[in-house]
């Protein structure tokens, strides 16, 4: 196993500096200096995306300042972990396959929610899985974030039907004056499960630099991450190989006896991210902005055997594999916006995301020889990517406070999949050999939409809207050695999605909002065409005959303002026809994933959210949520079984209960102490709910995880923090083994 000693030399300065910052002498000196040197700081509260665009959606948010106090964050997606009904399936620090689930959608359905950064789409709608369909979170550095808003449900006409889970809008900062920062993070996870016991470290370094000179503002950020993971998968079999001892007796997710023979997916990843943002004010009411982002990843993964022979030598079971990944991805966007706040405003945003290099080399031979080379495959996804164009206008015939505010727009996107896999005689260094499989195709969507916010009376507001979409999949091609090449037929579909929301505000403290929305979620190009083995070892099978999901969503939200807080209760229901649900199956040591249409599912429930500042005592902030969801399969004519049924069973990947609770105590403007808890009920991953055993590889446990963080602002330049995720060292599975107790340390300097 690779050396992952807990305190490598490059981290010693960070750890020493962090310890020094926490010493009483340093604190006393800094307090004296700050009293004389620190100017008064005025914090401007930014508005959410929903408020800016008058969108009729329930929205929960977190600002950069709040995240810095409360969240042990190495990557931007970490900042979402305490928002109501949001779970990012992140298996380890640096995981590039981290889809987001919501109150009605599962953790393996990346295309059922949307993630944007300043209007640039980060959701990889080339697939709907937890692999290459995962959002490109890594294109945003935590240090550039101003705020993150999560909008629940498909009630805004300006978003595609993929919004029926949620829309996450990341707003990043642009400077008004010179500013710069450097930050160092480190983390250590002590992991012990089956025959693997080790400490896995991660370290991150980031820097930002920005300024404004007249009409031009610019921002540059860079980020470097070096991380080691715990096992991602395990090798199992009904019995251990003859002549071997060791292994661990267990049961699979259906309760059958198995032996855990070894671990796979012990991953070392090194990632770099750089981004340049430019904005120019042509006039006080017209601004253009350009963003260019680059990300690269070099990762290698290996296996570990738990078996020995009578002499004590290692026995290597089949199923162990090594792989290396080389990735380079580019994003760019150009936007032009008017901001008169008069009768008419407009904006245009065009973006491109390109996977310029994406090579995964995987061994197929037997260990131990395969660790150093030999037969394998090379999967090449280079050339995959997407383009988007959005046009929007806002008409205010009676001004910003008039009876009508009409917004309308057009949208176009195209997604391209390129995914050949080649055989090679030397998996870690050889060139392409014979073509093994090939998957190609494109999808495109055109749409027009409109929305009218109509103030019926002083305390009544109605929002009417609709979206019409034209979709097609074309250029589909699949190749396999056994069957040869197949050109898939072109597929077209279209439809209208109406939206309606009515809000009643009888006083300053109460608001009642009823919303209804229809959404169409068209199949992704990957669901239709991609046949590939991912870096996680899972084979994903396509289905070119999939139908679009048709979603009817409704919500009644009741919100009451409190003194320095709020409480909200939401009743919601979601009916999905032709639900696209991914299933997994294991044949021998091979795990396969496939997608099928389910006739109808229904998810309905209730959500309670509380936020209160100065709760009980001054300086104590409480945030919490509790959600119950009854998620059921109502029809599934494609399921055939002599022994079981899927109708009436729970919808896969949606838990019955979820809860979060976060308490942050700020005795002054320097210290912030946070204790947080996250709970999720168990999940089912099969349509007939036969995965009765949760605590196993490919099972889905219920879990309660507690985290803590303490942050200290030393002076106007220096800040430091320490924290722990999973304080009680909860051992749990969400298909994969999830991180155990992890320690964090952070040191930051703002110029």
PLM-predicted stretches and their roles:
Residues 183, 457-462, 566, 572-576, ...:
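Gram-negative outer-membrane beta-barrel transporters
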Residues 39-71, 96-99, 127:
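N-terminal periplasmic "start-of-domain" segments of outer-membrane beta-barrel proteins
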Residues 281-283, 403-413, 439-574, 662-668, ...:
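Structural signature of Gram-negative outer-membrane beta-barrels, strongest in the C-terminal barrel
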Residues 198-300, 328-330, 446, 498:
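Transmembrane beta-barrel wall of Gram-negative outer-membrane proteins
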Residues 335-339, 345-361, 503-505, 511-517, ...:
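Membrane-embedded beta-barrel scaffold of Gram-negative outer-membrane proteins
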Residues 77-124:
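Extracytoplasmic beta-strand/coil segments of soluble accessory domains associated
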Residues 279-295, 323-480, 487, 503-505, ...:
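Face-selective signature of the C-terminal outer-membrane beta-barrel domain
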Residues 120-154:
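Short acidic/polar hinge/loop motifs at secondary-structure boundaries
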């Amino acid at each position: 196993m690779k050396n992952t000693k807990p305190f490598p030399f490059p981290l010693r300065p960070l750890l020493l500096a962090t310890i020094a910052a926490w010493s009483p002498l340093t604190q006393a000196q800094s307090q004296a200096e700050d009293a004389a040197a620190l100017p008064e700081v005025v914090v401007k509260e930014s508005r959410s995306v929903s408020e800016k665009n008058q969108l009729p959606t329930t929205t929960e948010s977190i600002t950069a300042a709040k995240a810095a106090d409360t969240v042990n964050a190495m990557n931007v997606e970490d900042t979402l972990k305490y928002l109501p009904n949001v779970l990012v399936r992140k298996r380890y620090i640096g995981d590039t396959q981290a889809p987001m689930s919501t109150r009605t959608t599962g953790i393996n359905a990346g295309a059922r929610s949307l993630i944007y950064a300043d209007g640039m789409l980060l959701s990889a709608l080339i697939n709907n899985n937890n692999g290459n369909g995962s959002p490109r979170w890594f294109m945003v550095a935590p240090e550039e974030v101003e705020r993150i808003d999560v909008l629940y449900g498909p009630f805004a006409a300006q978003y595609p039907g993929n919004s029926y889970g949620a829309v996450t809008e990341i707003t990043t900062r642009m400077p008004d004056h010179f500013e710069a920062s450097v930050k160092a993070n480190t983390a250590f996870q002590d992991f012990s499960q089956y025959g693997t016991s080790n400490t896995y470290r991660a370290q991150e370094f980031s820097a930002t630099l920005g300024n404004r000179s007249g009409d031009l503002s610019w921002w540059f950020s860079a980020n470097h991450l070096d991380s080691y993971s715990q096992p991602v998968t395990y090798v199992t079999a009904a019995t251990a190989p003859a002549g071997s001892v060791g292994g661990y007796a267990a049961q699979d997710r259906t309760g059958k006896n198995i032996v855990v023979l070894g671990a796979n997916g012990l991953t070392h990843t090194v990632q770099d991210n750089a981004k340049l943002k430019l904005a120019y004010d042509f006039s006080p009411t017209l601004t253009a902005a350009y963003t260019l982002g680059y990300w690269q990843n070099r990762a290698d993964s290996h296996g570990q055997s738990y078996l020995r022979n009578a002499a004590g030598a290692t026995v290597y079971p089949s199923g162990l594999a090594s792989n290396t990944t080389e990735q380079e991805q580019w994003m760019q966007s150009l936007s032009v916006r008017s901001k008169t706040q008069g009768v008419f405003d407009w904006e245009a945003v065009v973006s491109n995301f390109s996977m310029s290099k994406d090579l995964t080399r995987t061994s197929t031979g037997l260990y131990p020889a395969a660790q150093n080379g030999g037969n394998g495959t090379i999967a090449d996804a280079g050339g995959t990517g997407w383009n988007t164009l959005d046009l929007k206008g806002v008409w205010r015939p009676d001004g910003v406070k008039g009876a009508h505010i009409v917004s309308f727009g057009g949208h176009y996107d195209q997604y391209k999949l390129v995914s050949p896999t080649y055989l090679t005689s030397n998996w870690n260094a050889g060139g392409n050999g014979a073509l093994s499989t090939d998957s190609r195709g494109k999808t495109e969507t055109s749409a027009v939409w409109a929305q009218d916010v109509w103030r019926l009376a002083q305390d009544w507001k109605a929002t009417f809207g609709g979206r019409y979409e034209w979709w097609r999949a074309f250029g589909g091609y699949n190749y396999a050695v056994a069957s040869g090449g197949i050109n898939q037929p072109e597929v077209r579909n279209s439809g209208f999605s109406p939206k309606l929301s009515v809000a009643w505000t009888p006083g300053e403290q109460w608001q009642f909002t009823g919303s209804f929305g229809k959404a169409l979620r068209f199949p992704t190009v990957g669901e239709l065409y991609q046949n590939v083995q991912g870096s996680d070892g899972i084979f994903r099978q396509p289905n070119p005959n999939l139908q679009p999901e048709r979603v009817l969503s409704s919500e009644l939200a009741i919100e009451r303002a409190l003194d320095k807080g709020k409480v909200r209760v939401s009743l919601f229901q979601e009916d999905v026809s032709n639900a696209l649900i991914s299933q997994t199956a294991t044949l021998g040591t091979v795990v396969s994933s496939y997608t099928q249409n389910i006739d109808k599912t229904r998810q309905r429930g209730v959500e309670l959210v509380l936020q209160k500042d100065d709760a009980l005592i001054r300086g104590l902030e409480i945030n919490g949520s509790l959600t119950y969801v009854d998620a059921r399969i109502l029809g599934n004519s494609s399921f055939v079984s002599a022994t079981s049924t899927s109708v009436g069973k729970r919808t896969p990947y949606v838990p019955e209960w979820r809860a979060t609770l976060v308490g942050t105590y700020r005795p002054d403007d320097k210290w912030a102490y946070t204790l947080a808890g996250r709970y999720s009920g168990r999940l089912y991953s099969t349509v007939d709910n036969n995965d009765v055993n949760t605590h196993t590889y490919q099972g889905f446990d219920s879990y309660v995880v507690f985290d803590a963080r303490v942050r200290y602002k030393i002076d106007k330049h220096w800040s430091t923090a320490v924290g722990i995720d999973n304080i009680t060292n909860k051992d749990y599975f969400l298909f994969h083994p999830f991180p155990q107790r992890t320690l964090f340390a952070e040191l930051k300097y703002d110029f």
